[in-house]
Amino acid sequence: CNCDSSWSGGPTEWRRVAAMATVYDVKMAHHEEPQVASHLLASIPHGTYLENFHPKRDPIWHNIIANRPQLKDGNLTLTDNPGLGWELDRDYIKKYRISERVTEAK
């Protein structure tokens, strides 16, 4: 089952699909978005593969996450940091920012 959490209702719904797939002995994958898919697939025993694209095809995955897990021997080792574990590359964000909006508290 190649389910996409961004189109199917989010990570919780994706895990519900994964639970149903277990009942029918169906392997799970995730369509695109390796920054989220890697964590979802690591959370189940019947995950199969992670789609990972060339940096020109998926520049956000390859550039905006400063501590992006590196692919080695076909595997990713995820961080132990809270949540998705991302540390954003502020310089990359600044490079492509259109404007900087500052809201003052009154």
PLM regions with names:
Residues C1-N75:
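Shared catalytic-loop signature of beta/alpha-barrel
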